[in-house]
Design a protein with these regions (language model features):
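Conserved nucleotide-sugar phosphate-binding/catalytic loop shared by glycosyltransferases and other
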Residues: 5-7, 13-14, 32-82
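Donor-nucleotide binding loops and adjacent catalytic segments primarily
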Residues: 171, 185-247
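Short, polar loop motifs at secondary-structure junctions
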Residues: 42-47, 107-114, 241-247
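Short amphipathic alpha-helix
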Residues: 20-30, 45
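Conserved nucleotide-sugar donor-binding subdomain of glycosyltransferases
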Residues: 74-114
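A short, glycine/small-residue-rich beta-strand->loop->alpha-helix junction that serves as a flexible
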Residues: 12-24, 218-221
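Short internal beta-strands
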Residues: 36-43, 156-161, 237-243
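Active-site-proximal region of nucleotide-activated glycan assembly enzymes
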Residues: 118-183
């Protein structure tokens, strides 16, 4: 009996370009395995996926529209929770519609907590399985909410190494008990030692350090300014890839 082709929905969060970019090697691997791939996101993340995979169907999902208006991350997220909760519900409705209309058999959701369906195998791609908050009581409560959200998924894929050295530290380690967790290692859309765009940017400049930025504003710009100040104080040569869409 021939194998049935799987139809996989890949849906990264639109929070900078990092989530969409790290889905690129997964999408290529799925295509190599013969799966039919459908893409879904919003904003710059969706634009990146459409540019990378113009031959694949791509659909708009509701936007979380998260904004950082203060330096307090907890307060920033807490005050936007009603809108985020509504967006997740709308995202879940949109996902169920895509599953019905396109015969989707599996979902890989990169940090989109509404992208799951009762009729599919659901995977969430995230490096954040432990939340870290300065207040112990808030941290416990936040992690209970996170675990409830993660329970909606059959598997958790962590884009990091299972052992030291790793990038995400306490956010991803140790693995959560009672969850199916797989550590994938680091994911990058770049093949080879250096992406062609970065090679062109550094050509003839003898740069020692490449700084690749992404993320939501205004935090991306704040980080850029801090790193620029530090770069000017160091003897090394830097090249900055600013991760600004439309530039």
């Amino acid at each position: 009996m021939p194998n049935v082709q799987q139809t996989i929905l890949v849906a990264p969060l639109n929070w900078g370009l990092g989530h969409a970019a790290r889905c690129v090697p997964l999408i290529k691997a799925l295509e190599h395995l013969g799966a039919k791939v459908i893409l879904a996101s919003d904003g710059a993340a969706l634009n990146l996926l459409r540019a990378e995979f113009p031959h694949l169907p791509a659909f708009q999902l509701p936007s979380y529209r998260i904004r950082y208006q203060t330096d307090n991350m907890v307060w920033n997220i807490a005050r936007q929770m009603p809108r985020i909760t509504y967006a997740i519900r709308a995202e879940q409705w949109a996902t169920e519609r895509l599953v019905r209309e396109h015969g989707i058999t599996g979902i890989i959701s990169d940090n989109r907590y509404g992208c799951f369906s009762g009729g599919t195998h659901n995977v969430i791609l995230t490096h954040q399985i432990h939340l870290r908050v300065s207040n112990a009581a808030l941290q416990w409560a936040a992690n209970q909410v996170l675990r409830l959200a993660l329970r909606k998924f059959d598997s958790i894929w962590v884009p990091d190494s299972a052992t030291d050295p790793n990038f995400s530290g306490e956010l991803s380690h140790p693995p959560l008990k009672g969850f199916d967790i797989k550590y994938l290692g680091l994911l990058s859309r770049f093949s080879g030692d250096q992406p062609p765009g970065l090679a062109n940017a550094t050509a003839g400049k003898n740069a020692n350090v490449a700084v690749v930025l992404s993320g939501p504003e205004p935090q991306r710009t704040y980080l850029e300014q801090i790193l620029l100040e530090q770069a000017l104080a160091l003897p090394h040569k830097f090249v900055f890839v600013k991760g600004k869409t439309g530039s």
